[in-house]
Amino acid sequence: MATFRNNHMKTKASVRKSFSEDVFQSVKSLLQSQKELCSVTAEDCLQQDEHANLTEVTFLGFNEETDAAHIQDLAAVSLELPDILNSLHFCSLNENEIICMKNINKPLDISSDPLNQSHPSGMLCVMRVSPTSPRLRIDFIFSLLSKYATGIRYTLDTFLHQKHQLETTDEDDDDTNQSVSSIEDDFVTAFEHLEEEETSKPYNDGMNITVLRSQCDAASQTVTGHHLETHDLKILISSGQQKSLAKPSTSSVNVLGHKELPSVKTSVTTSISEPWTQRSFYRSSNASDKDSDLQKTFFSSSPAYSSESECSSPSPVIFLDEEGYQKSLKAKLELPKIPVMKDDIEDSDSEVSEFFDSFDQFDELEQTLETCLFNKDPVIGKSSQRKGHKHGKSCMNPQKFKFDRPALPANVRKPTPRKPESPYGNLCDAPDSPRPVKASREDSGLFSPIRSSAFSPLGGCTPAECFCQTDIGGDRIHENHDSVYYTYEDYAKSISCEVLGSVLRTHHTNTLSNINSIKHGENKTVTFKHGNLDQKNKSKNKSLMIKDSIQKFAADLVEKSFGSAFKDLQKGVSSCTNALYHLAIKLTSSVLQMAFDELRRQRAFSLKERAISGLANFLVSEALSNALKDLQYVKKQIFTNTVARFAADLAEELVFEGIMEVCQFSYPQTPASPQCGSFDFEDKVVKLYAKDLSESVIQEAFIELSQVDVTFTTKAAVSVSTDNIKYVSAESVVPSTQAVTFSPSFHNQAIMVTKPVQEYKKEYTVQQALFCTSGIVTSIPVPLAGSALLPYHISSTACQAKAHLSSDDSNSNGDSAQVHIATKNREEKAACLRNICLPSEHNPGNQNDFKPTNDDIEMQSSSKLPNDPAIISNFSAAVVHTIVNETLESMTSLEVTKMVDERTDYLTKSLKEKTPPFSHCDQAVLQCSEASSNKDMFADRLSKSIIKHSIDKSKSVIPNIDKNAVYKESLPVSGEESQLTPEKSPKFPDSQNQLTHCSLSAAKDCVPECKVSMVHGSSLETLPSCPAVTGQKSDLKESAKDQPLKKHNLNSTSLEALSFGQENPFPHSHTFSSTALTCVDGLHVEDKQKVRDRNVIPDTPPSTPLVPSRASSEWDIKKLTKKLKGELAKEFAPATPPSTPHNSSVGSLSENEQNTIEKEEFMLKLMRSLSEEVESSESGELPEVDVKSEHSGKKVQFAEALATHILSLATEMAASHLDNKIIQEPKVKNPCLNVQSQRSVSPTFLNPSDENLKTLCNFAGDLAAEVITEAEKIAKVRNCMLFKQKKNSCYADGDEDYKVEEKLDIEAVVHPREVDPFILSLPPSSCMSGLMYKYPSCESVTDEYAGHLIQILKQEGGNSELIMDQYANRLAYRSVKSGLQEAAKTTKVQCNSRMFPVPSSQVKTNKELLMFSNKEHHQEADKKRQSKRNEGYFCKNQTCERTLDPYRNEVSQLYSFSTSLVHSITKDAKEELTASLVGLPKSLTDSCLFEKSGYEEDNECHVTPELPKSLQPSSQNHRFYHSTGSLNGYGCGDNVVQAVEQYAKKVVDDTLELTLGSTVFRVSETTKSADRVTYAEKLSPLTGQACRYCDLKELHNCTGNSSQHFFRQGSLASSKPASNPKFSSRYQKSRIFHLSVPQIHVNLDKKAVLAEKIVAEAIEKAERELSSTSLAADSGIGQEGASFAESLATETMTAAVTNVGHAVSSSKEIEDFQSTESVSSQQMNLSIGDDSTGSWSNLSFEDEHQDESSSFHHLSESNGNSSSWSSLGLEGDLYEDNLSFPTSDSDGPDDKDEEHEDEVEGLGQDGKTLLITNIDMEPCTVDPQLRIILQWLIASEAEVAELYFHDSANKEFMLLSKQLQEKGWKVGDLLQAVLQYYEVMEKASSEERCKSLFDWLLENA
């Protein structure tokens, strides 16, 4: 029994349906049903296009305990819902009733999926679920079943039919606009049917009404507001009969649809309650005309009307048809006289008002429908059949009958009264005047329509106002006579009377009687007394017969003539009135229509206008703001450019003048003269000079600027100058480090000129910041770097002076330089300049000092004096290095190279010879001064060369000068450089002290130098790498530097390192992006930092990516000018030219202080620009390298010397690093340790034994030669590539390193130690260095570093990829660490460090070496070597192509990242798992661990499946290495695996989720989302930017074992997307944003749109994934992020490990990565089964998703292998989905298959799709599993094609449904199984009872 209730919501109709016991019959049919189970999908997998066909039903369950609060909660579903429910008295529902409501607006709460907005909201079924009924009782299930069945069927029918009909019949929805005649026809037919059926179907409450046919009319379909105002209409719907129809217009619904579903029979009754009075259900004809079965349901009118009044016209407007009208006209008339009186004519206004009233009533469709009797008496042909007799209020033509008319003239007869028995008598107000028995023929109906309005209001007239109606006898009663009628009648009568009178003279009585009756007021009675007249006439004498006949004749005559006339007249009049009325109607309706249209149009127009204007305003404002921004920017640019240009010109002039001036100061001093005093004096002079100069310059500048068309106010000048200061100073700082070597004199001069010492101090902040940044670059904790720098400020100058004085030129330079560097770059500049200038003068002293060790000691003391001599020495070393580098660079032109070679030879010799004189050569190198004694000459030359450089900016000039200088000096400039080193170094070989000094130049610098030497050591380490890389760049230079450095190696190296580092500190920051972390920079910087940071052990120096160690002279000049600019700017800082230099300086200082922050920012920017410049210069430099290659022989010699030092130092350093580690070869260790201690500044370490030196030298020589050659080759090959892929530089270096490594490998056995340094030099990018897990400091460093980098990058707005990388690094690092810790906890496995025999001794040595060097690097090296050996040079063979890949850049970074990540992960994991690892298949763990390291290894690593064998787990430190050996046990301990899995999950999840998510979001905000997407799309095929690292790692790894591993893992993850939806979706989101990172400039509009799209997509996806794939709660993975993440990570990791294990074991011998790949892909499927957690194992992806890999195959087309995100647990398919936005095909793991099934299953169906949402109002006791199953059953029975569930917890159900479908279960089977389950459960014991329905079904399936 279904109740329609009016919810007073215009849009909703509710139907209350209840079920009789018949339901149980239908249940039987269900039990036997053999229908297929429909496919089930999570709502999230819904595709956009499916939403259109989607029918949605929501079941809302409540019970007795549901209270108001619960109901109010439903506001979340729909705001109106609580009110509707309450108004429906839903609480009164009984157990077998449900209420169906349509069109409940669904707010976002329910359909957060944006797709859901598009489809019409569905049905809401409210049902009572009484908790009292025992849950396991079968009848409870039946009642649930029936409720769901009714709701679902009702919904389907409603919506499907509605769709049908909206398509087929939506013609005449607006009934008021139908043409009148069609309405009339409608009702005619309707009433005829009614009449026929009325008798057979008496209307009663039990009346059976069937389901609507599909032809149900459109009126009912369009539910208008009125329809819904009905009150309680109960409709019983029974499926039995299809013939009759109950169609309440309120139900905008077809109950149960025309496709009757046999299984459920519901019977429905209809009853009507009181409020139906005066309501008419009005329905348009369309369907009803066509379908004779259709019936109107009529409801008895309100009790006010008698039962007789059973007919009322259903339609407000009814006309006679033409035929009836004709008939009415044929009736004979008696024509009265026609007195025309004003009163009798109703004014037209009243008619019009009536007309409109009739419409009002017409619109109230509340009048009840009343059946009308149709008089269908065929006998009465004459009488027109009034098709709808209107009675009561529904009269059709109610004309007010005016009873207050004045009396008719006496001769007019009264109308005849109605017969008393006339059915209409009771309707008349006329007095009961007697009625003559006989009705004369004149009574035949004369219908006078003249005054009757066709549109008189419905039911608005009194009973008397009816039309004349024929009574059964056919008599016509004329009731509504008009005045006209009376006039005619009287006229006729008077004429006839006169005629008769004239003939018979007997008419008086009649006339009198008429007059009397009129006087009596009987005119009200319309009675004709013709009968009496006739009788009187007849009663006359027979003699009067003639008269009678005459009378008759006259009467006939009159009748005929007048009758015909009147008939014609009547016809004309009526047609006229009809026409007029029609016209009036049409006019009014059209007028109204037009008016409304106009209103609507105007409103729309205004809205549109408003919208457009709003839009326009917005656009205009945007445009304006953008324009303004651009304008400002342009202005700024113009201004800056102008100022910059001016500054540059100025700087050049200044430089020239300044140099000239300075040259005057640089008069030679006698060695005896007190150098310190002169130095101080000169300082003052220089400062004063600088100030004066700056004043004049400033004045000139203002003059210049005033001429520029840029408005240049003082303020502007000030700001500009400050900016410049910041910019330039920053720049100069960088260059200073970089360019120091080139023209320290310039720097010194400039600095000296412009800055007083105090300034330095104040500026230190900026410089410090710079340093910090450089430190950051190298991943030194900022604070450390800062602290290191602080001491230098004050001391630097003193140190410099002393250093200069005390130590040799080189030393002094070095020290001072170091000091300067320490002080800050500026100081460096200043110091260097001073040093250079002064040193040139002091040189003799220095040289002298230098030669003797005493001098060195003095130096040390002097340096000590300043502050931290060690630091100073470091800096000095760095400076020296830089200087040397720069000089070498400047000399690098071809000629120079030759000289360099010569020099090299000379130097090497001198080194051996230990020629102290050359010490000055350091300065000489700087200055190319030939004779150390000729300080003046040296100074002059220096200044000249510098000036020339600055002026000419041409390398050629420099070389010439250099040559000259060289010749004079007898050393080429490069020679000089080398000389510098050699000078020191010569001593080094000769005397142990010198050796010590030389080696570290520490002896000279003593403690400081030791530190320096340490620096050197580190730098050496770096150098080795540098040589490899630099070899390309300027191997010669480096080698030259290094060789001379042999002794000074330390210094020079450190310098080099510094110089590189410094040069690149910026590049470095930049380099990240560009030079793949210019390893050199990284190394050097690292070294520096390490030096500063004694804690930090120099990790493997990243191979020097082509840091342009030797910038062209132009570069130097640029740097110089920059510095100058900086100084100038400082001077300028005071807006106006300072009145006194002091003031200006003070002002600048204060400003500087204020602007420190800005300066720092500037520095960052500066670093950036510098790095760019450096990079560009790098590209320039490569060719030079090639040129150098010509002189390979000399190079080799040089290389030997260099190599010896490098190797010794590097090995020593490495050894020192490793002291805490278990070193397999202690011998190697010792020297290394020394080096390390050196860092600690223990001079002892500085003294390598002669033997060591010799062996090292020999080995180094060979090595160096090879390195150089290799490097050159590589450089040549890769020049272009390198530059293209700056990031790749590391990679390239790596290759070189590989080659070197190969060589080393060969030699490694012999000189394992030596190998180390190179290994150290492996390309681990700087990021990696930070990640070294070994050193605790490093961890923090990495974090800080990453953070800082990120900040810088963000500020620079620069490379989003870099930023992401940093994030990823940091994140990965943290997550890995924490994950490992977690894993350790969970596993509780103690680390057993085991060493396994290494298959090849070589490998062993390598390994050991590796161990010594940073593990990661070693690993890489080992792996690389091994992989090279084992599988051929991977890069060469397999990945040469890849090398070319643009990805290489990323690859290197990836390696670094992955390495670090992998290392830490593997390390920890292995540690924790070692014990259990034994149980794991060797390959498994190894591949896992090694692969990871392998990633870094690059392609080679990829090859590493074999690596595991070779690698030995040397020590715990090398946990990563627990090589295959450790894993030999094949039994995988579940716990281990699980631990790994957990850890992996956690790591992955936390990492990605937390970091990437948040950071990415931030980042993405800055980046424009549009680019995001586009970029993402671009990326999608090959590079997953998501976690670029992981991606690339995987990509590259894919090729090799690691790739398999990842691939496998990824495939696992991807293949099991269902299991970790949450995680994947999370990832996915972050990934999208990741992708977005790369591009930065986007239009706002696009951005907004894009962002929306992306967000929508992401959310959609995420949701989809969540529902389709999230593990069911039972799987044990909590939904809380952490636990979930953990479990997920664990799973991922485990799967990965397992897979890898299989893959490795299977493919160990496979050298071709492709084969590995295939194995891995197979493995993917295998692993699914192995999954130890088992939560995924249920998903049988093997069959369903074999194409899964293909779905994201394109990710790694380059490898031919489907990459996976598994390394970080990323889901490949997700990634793909995001990128390729047509995701819908493969979002859910199940979708594809389901779709195919549906295609098969539902071909014959109309493809019904149903979305079911269940809402429980607390406390509701339906078992959700039962509910889902039952709904599924019903939907299947109803032949739904696709069933979607909104509940996200139905993962298990998805599984179950899949299995059941596969097993071929039918609806009946499933229902029986459910019933059986409950029966079993009733009998089962309490333990068994806990088994859920799904589980039970799965078991029994």
Swiss-Prot record:
One of its GO terms (molecular function) is protein kinase A regulatory subunit binding. It is found in: Cytoplasm; Cytoplasm, Cytoskeleton, Microtubule organizing center, Centrosome. Residues 1747-1756 have a biased composition (Basic and acidic residues). Its main location: cytoplasm. Residues 1787-1801 have a biased composition (Acidic residues). Residues 1650-1663 are annotated as: PKA-RII subunit binding domain. Residues 1141-1153, 1713-1740 have a biased composition (Polar residues). Residues 407-443, 843-864, 971-993, 1131-1153, 1708-1805 are annotated as: Disordered. The keyword Metal-binding does not apply. Keywords: Cytoplasm, Cytoskeleton, Phosphoprotein. This is A-kinase anchor protein 11. Expressed in heart, brain, lung, liver, kidney, testis and ovary. Weakly expressed in skeletal muscle, pancreas and spleen. It comes from Homo sapiens. The modification Phosphoserine is found at S18, S422, S433, S444, S448, S1171, S1176, S1177, S1242, S1337, S1580. RII-alpha binding site, predicted to form an amphipathic helix, could participate in protein-protein interactions with a complementary surface on the R-subunit dimer. One of its GO terms (biological process) is protein localization to endosome. The modification Phosphothreonine is found at T981, T1100, T1485. It comes from the Eukaryota. Binds to type II regulatory subunits of protein kinase A and anchors/targets them. PANTHER family: A KINASE ANCHOR PROTEIN, A-KINASE ANCHOR PROTEIN 11. One of its GO terms (cellular component) is cytosol. Belongs to the AKAP110 family. Residues 1757-1772 have a biased composition (Low complexity). Transmembrane segments: none annotated.
